[in-house]
Amino acid sequence: MKEIIKSEIFKILGRDFVLEKPKDKSLAHYATPLAFSLAKELKKSPVAIANELACKFENSKIFEVSAVNGYLNFKLKGEFLDEISKDALKNGDKFASGKARQDGSTFIEYISANPTGPLHIGHVRGAVYGDTLARIGTHLGYKIFTEYYINDAGNQIDLLGTSISLAARDVLFHENVEYPQKYYRGEYIVDIANEALKKFGKEIFYDEARNLELAEFGKDIVLDIIKKDLAGVGISIQGWASEKALYKELEPTIEKLKRSNQMYEKEGATYIASTTLGDDNDRVVVRNDGRPTYLAGDIIYHNDKFERNYDHYINIWGADHHGYIARLKAAIHFLGYDENRLEIILMQMVSLLKDGKPYKMSKRAGNAVLMSDIVEEIGSDALRFIFISKANTSSLEFDIDELKKEDSSNPIFYINYAHARVNQIFAKAGKSVSDVLDASLENLDDNAKNLLFEALILPEILEDAFASRQLQKVSDYLKSLAASFHKFYNENRVIGSANEESLLKLFAVVALSLRTALSLIGITAKDRM
């Protein structure tokens, strides 16, 4: 809709302009301060220029134009809103979607938690954010690919095997064992030990030579748990890349780096000269004993990603990884790629409360709040909504009990209630959407037109949210639209009114926007409550 409007304005004005959205919709749906930028050039006051420009729109079929204090205000006509509404309702699930784009293909890597335990609260924000970003991008017509990088080649995998062995001997065999300072603990480790006992027998827990075999067995079980947990909140990741499998590319990748002349040897170790591109220190890629560092694994993986030739790459990380960005981007540059094609999105911390107090740690995980525990308590919908309700650059704190309330203080309840309410109204009227598709919206009053306008701007909201990476704009939009609908419905009679069918059509558009936006954040709209 916005593109149609901009095209119409440009056709009449014949020059570029900025289109704004006034906060007060009673004044206008859109406005431009063009007259202010023309004042110096034309040597006239903005008020005089705006008055002259407004006259050029007298015959527009799209909007009524007025000049107010130097601004050009555009109020959309009912006929145009009716046409857009009818198209939206006919498109159904495809409403607010874009045509397949030839550029802008995007590779999104997110979560990438170590395969050593179930997903916990620290992973949830990035998981929900990444999946929502992918859903919106796909809906807008971008080619999107999502991937989870499995960190299965480091010391943490050896430690997983050791932890399983010790848990078996301690819990299953009741032996006195000495645990290291760092190890994985929790009921899930004991569960894995039980499964290993069934498959391999008791001997594997005492044979150090088989620790890696035990670790791989545990890793596979943990990955199954992770995939199940993700499926429980509607997240399906397309690719799963193994760090261990990619290590066969270590030598070719090192050779590729060397061609940049930004690698050197020092005391037997191999460094990249990342300080030349703004890093605090040069970084070791291969240790003096020949073992690759964690950075080496990331370099190999990003070389693999860039070889797949997407236009844009996004990594979604925890905020504590901020210091890692410069070294990785330097390495990508040394590999011969444009490091600006990689965008790092950082997730700030999450604090979880229950009845105003810190949420209790899970026995299953030993020392963490598990994602599955939260889903069990509040459901997938509430979890997904709350985790995109605030900018990723801000810390997030919420109370579980607040999300269980069935009133307007609980945003997901209030939004779903709006959608269910529309269905209830249609049922009471004994009509379907197809029955009111041809009802005219031209003669609706300003309040109704403003509600309709708010419902129809979803495409703009999605484009803005995706481009700015500020996904909270979608949840903010949902809250605003639901509130506007409830207010309008409470103030206006629908069933039995003279314009019943027109209002039902308006409500159908509202429900479509609510349903579409909810689906793009991974929530199925409720038809009844």
UniProtKB/Swiss-Prot annotation:
GO biological processes: arginyl-tRNA aminoacylation
Pfam families in alphabetical order: Arg_tRNA_synt_N, DALR_1, tRNA-synt_1d
Reaction(s) catalysed (UniProt annotation): tRNA(Arg) + L-arginine + ATP = L-arginyl-tRNA(Arg) + AMP + diphosphate
Sequence motif 'HIGH' region, location on chain: 113-123
Main localization (coarse): cytoplasm
Any one annotated GO CC term: cytoplasm
Family matches, as CDD domains: ArgRS_core (cd00671)
Gene3D superfamilies, alphabetized: Arginyl tRNA synthetase N-terminal domain, HUPs, Isoleucyl-tRNA Synthetase, Domain 1
GO molecular function: arginine-tRNA ligase activity; ATP binding
Keywords tagged on the record: Aminoacyl-tRNA synthetase, ATP-binding, Cytoplasm, Ligase, Nucleotide-binding, Protein biosynthesis
Enzyme class: ligase
Subcellular location: Cytoplasm
Signal peptide: none
InterPro entries: aa-tRNA-synth_I_CS (IPR001412), Arg-tRNA-ligase (IPR001278), Arg-tRNA-synth_N (IPR005148), Arg-tRNA-synth_N_sf (IPR036695), ArgRS_core (IPR035684), DALR_anticod-bd (IPR008909), Rossmann-like_a/b/a_fold (IPR014729), tRNAsynth_Ia_anticodon-bd (IPR009080)
EC number of this enzyme: 6.1.1.19
Homology family: Belongs to the class-I aminoacyl-tRNA synthetase family.
Assembly information from the UniProt record: Monomer.
PANTHER family: ARGININE--TRNA LIGASE, CYTOPLASMIC, ARGINYL-TRNA SYNTHETASE
NCBIfam families according to UniProt: argS (TIGR00456)
Designated name of the protein: Arginine--tRNA ligase
Annotated organism of origin: Campylobacter curvus (strain 525.92)
